[in-house]
From Swiss-Prot:
<comment type="subunit">
    <text>Homodimer.</text>
</comment>
<dbReference type="GO" id="GO:0008615">
    <property type="term" value="P:pyridoxine biosynthetic process"/>
</dbReference>
<feature type="binding site">
    <location>
        <position position="67"/>
    </location>
    <ligand>
        <name>substrate</name>
    </ligand>
</feature>
<keyword id="KW-0664">Pyridoxine biosynthesis</keyword>
<protein>
    <recommendedName>
        <fullName>Pyridoxine/pyridoxamine 5'-phosphate oxidase</fullName>
        <ecNumber>1.4.3.5</ecNumber>
    </recommendedName>
</protein>
<comment type="pathway">
    <text>Cofactor metabolism; pyridoxal 5'-phosphate salvage; pyridoxal 5'-phosphate from pyridoxamine 5'-phosphate: step 1/1.</text>
</comment>
<feature type="binding site">
    <location>
        <begin position="9"/>
        <end position="12"/>
    </location>
    <ligand>
        <name>substrate</name>
    </ligand>
</feature>
<dbReference type="Pfam" id="PF10590">
    <property type="entry name" value="PNP_phzG_C"/>
</dbReference>
<feature type="binding site">
    <location>
        <position position="83"/>
    </location>
    <ligand>
        <name>FMN</name>
    </ligand>
</feature>
<comment type="pathway">
    <text>Cofactor metabolism; pyridoxal 5'-phosphate salvage; pyridoxal 5'-phosphate from pyridoxine 5'-phosphate: step 1/1.</text>
</comment>
<keyword id="KW-0285">Flavoprotein</keyword>
<dbReference type="GO" id="GO:0010181">
    <property type="term" value="F:FMN binding"/>
</dbReference>
<comment type="function">
    <text>Catalyzes the oxidation of either pyridoxine 5'-phosphate (PNP) or pyridoxamine 5'-phosphate (PMP) into pyridoxal 5'-phosphate (PLP).</text>
</comment>
<feature type="binding site">
    <location>
        <begin position="77"/>
        <end position="78"/>
    </location>
    <ligand>
        <name>FMN</name>
    </ligand>
</feature>
<feature type="binding site">
    <location>
        <position position="106"/>
    </location>
    <ligand>
        <name>FMN</name>
    </ligand>
</feature>
<dbReference type="InterPro" id="IPR012349">
    <property type="entry name" value="Split_barrel_FMN-bd"/>
</dbReference>
<dbReference type="Pfam" id="PF01243">
    <property type="entry name" value="PNPOx_N"/>
</dbReference>
C-alpha cells in the first residue's frame, strides 16, 4: 500500500448525533441537515452519489444532483436511455449518498425508484438553461460517439432548429423519485466512534429508528 495514502486521515470533532434529538420523520430531519449544509456553504450541497445495479447485480455509481425533496421521495433528472436509466428500468432500486465534509456528515438513502410524471419532468426541463435543454436533446448519453465534434455539430444543428422556439421535452428524458425504505444519518466523531442513526420502514409504512455501531 502507498504509505502516503495510508497515512491520510482526519479526526472528526465538530458535532454529535443523539437519537433523542432526531425526531420521528427522517425526511424532515434530512431537510434540516440539508438547510444547515446550505448555510455552511457546502460546495454543491445537492450533489449525491447514485448507486444502481443491473438485474444480475452488477453495480454502478455516479454523481448526480438532487432537484427536489418531497414528503415521501427524493427527485433527480436524467436521460432515461443512459446506463443508469437502463439499469433502473430492469432493477428499480437505488441508493443515494450525500457527504458533506465541511459538517463531517453523511446521509445514505435506500429505496425503490419510480419515474415522475411527464408533466413534472416538463416543468423542470423548461426551468433549465436553454443550452442544457438542447444538450439533453442531442446527447445519446452513455453510448459511444466518434468524437467531440459529433456533439458540437448536433448542438449547433438543434440550436438553429429551435431558434425562436421552445425546446420540446424529449421522450428519453425526465425525472426519477427515490422512495426510501431506509435512511441512515452519520455524524463523524473522535476515535472513529461515529454516530449512526438508522430509520427503517415497518410493514405498516411507519418508521422505526435505532442506533448502529460505527
Amino acid at each position: 500500500m502507498n504509505s502516503k495514502i495510508s497515512e491520510i486521515r482526519k479526526n472528526y470533532s465538530l458535532s454529535s448525533l443523539d437519537i433523542g434529538d432526531i425526531g420521528d420523520d427522517p425526511i424532515s430531519f434530512f431537510q434540516k441537515w440539508f438547510e444547515e449544509a446550505v448555510l455552511s456553504e457546502v460546495l454543491e450541497v445537492n450533489a449525491m452519489t447514485l448507486a444502481t445495479a443491473t438485474k444480475d447485480g452488477k453495480p454502478n455509481a455516479r454523481i448526480v444532483l438532487l432537484k427536489e425533496i418531497l414528503e415521501d421521495s427524493f427527485v433527480f433528472y436524467t436521460n432515461y436511455e443512459s446506463k443508469k436509466g437502463r439499469e433502473l428500468e430492469e432493477n428499480p432500486r437505488a441508493c443515494l449518498v450525500f457527504f458533506w465534509s465541511e459538517l463531517e456528515r453523511q446521509v445514505r438513502i435506500e429505496g425503490g425508484v419510480k419515474k415522475v410524471s411527464r408533466e413534472e419532468s416538463n416543468v423542470y426541463f423548461h426551468s433549465r438553461p436553454r443550452g442544457s435543454q438542447i444538450g439533453a436533446v442531442v446527447s445519446p448519453q452513455s453510448y459511444e460517439i466518434p468524437n467531440r465534434k459529433f456533439l458540437e455539430e448536433r448542438f449547433e444543428e438543434f440550436s438553429k432548429l429551435y431558434e425562436g422556439k421552445e425546446v420540446d421535452l424529449p421522450n428519453h428524458w425526465g425525472g426519477y423519485a427515490v422512495h426510501p425504505n431506509r435512511i441512515e444519518f452519520w455524524q463523524g466523531r473522535s476515535s472513529r466512534l461515529h454516530d449512526r442513526i438508522v430509520f427503517e420502514k415497518d410493514t405498516d409504512s411507519s418508521w422505526k429508528k435505532f442506533r448502529v455501531a460505527p
